[in-house]
């Protein structure tokens, strides 16, 4: 009910008012959730019989980007070049019915070692209003997955119903998190390792990849932090557990200096500095894998839900 009301009213509420309201709500809840955010100690246990990461790496590093709008789409080349210079690779998730994603851009990303995924169809929040609505949208999403030769999916706003996602022709989903009580759907999966979601009815299964670092939008836009301590602290904990460090960073919110800073932006320098920190602090210790590579590995060792 809350989500339906939110999406019905959202177009009529000025964006700065939306941000002020969310910031006030988060401030009011911060003390309540201090024991489970940004670190939930109960999420750190590895799966039974966990064999570790390939090549005996200490942890996995998975960089992902959700491209929410045209502004973010136009910044993808700058972000890709930044990651290339620092010798990182990532995935880019696009919203196919919100803006046009050119075949040339997808081809460029893939040819340079990046991955392309599908990020829903739009951002109207109606995917789970009924089983019929989701089934219809799943058919359309599957067409984009096939057209793009993509194997991964992330739902807008991290909404999720893992049992319904079996309608999608995917190898992995990335619509959950270990802990994030400030999300519209705050139910975390309570783990920092990927896992397999099986459908006993028809044998279909996919790998679930929860994000394990707080999203950039929360840290830099809503909390308005101008430092990297939250990311560093959480990463140190995940690394200590040998888990998967999975980050979502949005090019929409990164300002590369081409325009004046807007209310929903932070300096792209923050992300670059974080990548340099990871490279220099954990050199040789991480497996910088694409989501599809994580999925393929988990399937080989069959880590079940």
Which residues does each predicted region cover?
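Conserved, mostly hydrophobic/aromatic
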Residues: 9, 66, 116-119, 153, ...
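Short, well-ordered coil/turn segments that N-cap beta-strands
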Residues: 57-61, 86-90, 111-116, 146-151, ...
């Amino acid at each position: 009910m809350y989500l339906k009301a939110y999406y019905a009213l959202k177009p009529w509420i000025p964006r700065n008012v939306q941000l002020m309201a969310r910031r006030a709500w988060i401030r009011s809840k911060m003390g309540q959730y201090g024991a489970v955010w940004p670190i939930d100690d109960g999420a750190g246990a590895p799966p039974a019989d966990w064999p570790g990461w390939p090549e005996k790496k200490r942890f996995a590093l998975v960089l992902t980007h959700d491209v929410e709008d045209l502004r973010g789409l136009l910044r993808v080349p700058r972000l890709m070049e930044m990651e290339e210079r620092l010798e990182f690779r990532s995935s880019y998730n696009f919203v196919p019915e919100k803006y046009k994603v050119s075949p040339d851009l997808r081809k460029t990303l893939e040819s340079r070692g990046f991955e392309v995924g599908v990020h829903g169809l739009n951002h109207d929040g109606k995917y789970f209003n009924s089983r019929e609505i989701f089934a219809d949208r799943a058919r359309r999403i599957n067409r984009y997955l096939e057209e793009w030769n993509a194997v991964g999916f992330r739902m807008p706003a991290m909404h999720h119903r893992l049992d319904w996602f079996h309608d999608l022709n995917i190898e992995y989903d990335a619509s959950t998190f270990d802990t994030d009580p400030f999300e519209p759907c705050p139910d975390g999966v309570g783990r920092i390792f990927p896992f397999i979601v099986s459908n006993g009815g028809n044998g279909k299964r996919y790998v679930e990849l929860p994000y394990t670092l707080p999203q950039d939008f929360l840290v830099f836009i809503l909390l308005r932090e101008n430092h990297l301590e939250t990311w560093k602290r959480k990463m140190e904990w995940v690394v200590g557990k040998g888990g998967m460090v999975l980050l979502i960073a949005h090019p929409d919110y990164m300002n590369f200096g081409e325009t004046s800073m807007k209310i929903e932006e932070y300096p792209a320098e923050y992300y670059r500095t974080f990548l340099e920190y990871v490279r220099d602090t954990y050199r040789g210790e991480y497996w910088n894998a694409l989501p599809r590579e994580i999925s393929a590995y988990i399937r080989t060792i069959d880590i079940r839900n």
